[in-house]
């Protein structure tokens, strides 16, 4: 495991309709994480930051999307690729995600 701090691994929580439904129904929380973070690093970071017990971590890399840049040449650019982690917690553990998002 690397010597990075937990807040260097977890970038921000992702709060969407789908992630809220996962939170309420399945106790799964969604985070944007560092692109080179591994599953054990993500598990360690979530457990240290929120004092909870992690059951499982699923990760995926979100592909870059093509975007138009409106200048006089109408060029195309892309967004950056990023990594998303869906963290499943043990029963009885909860995270106050809105409190973390405000920090």
UniProtKB/Swiss-Prot annotation:
GO terms for molecular function: rRNA binding; structural constituent of ribosome. PROSITE patterns: RIBOSOMAL_L23. The keyword Glycoprotein does not apply. Keywords: Ribonucleoprotein, Ribosomal protein, RNA-binding, rRNA-binding. GO terms for cellular component: cytosolic large ribosomal subunit. The keyword Transmembrane does not apply. It comes from the Bacteria. GO terms for biological process: translation. Belongs to the universal ribosomal protein uL23 family. Part of the 50S ribosomal subunit. Contacts protein L29, and trigger factor when it is bound to the ribosome. One of the early assembly proteins it binds 23S rRNA. One of the proteins that surrounds the polypeptide exit tunnel on the outside of the ribosome. Forms the main docking site for trigger factor binding to the ribosome. This is Large ribosomal subunit protein uL23. The lineage of its organism: Bacteria, Pseudomonadati, Aquificota, Aquificia, Aquificales. The gene is rplW.
């Amino acid at each position: 495991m690397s010597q990075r701090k937990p807040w260097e691994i977890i970038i921000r929580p992702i709060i969407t309709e789908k992630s809220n439904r996962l939170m309420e129904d399945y106790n799964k929380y969604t985070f944007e994480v560092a692109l080179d973070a591994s599953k054990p690093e993500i598990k360690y970071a979530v457990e240290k930051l929120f004092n909870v017990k992690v059951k499982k971590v699923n990760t995926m890399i979100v592909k870059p999307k093509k975007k138009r840049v409106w200048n006089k040449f109408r060029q195309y650019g892309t967004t950056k690729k990023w990594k998303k982690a869906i963290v499943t917690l043990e029963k009885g553990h909860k995270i106050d995600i809105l409190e973390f998002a405000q920090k």
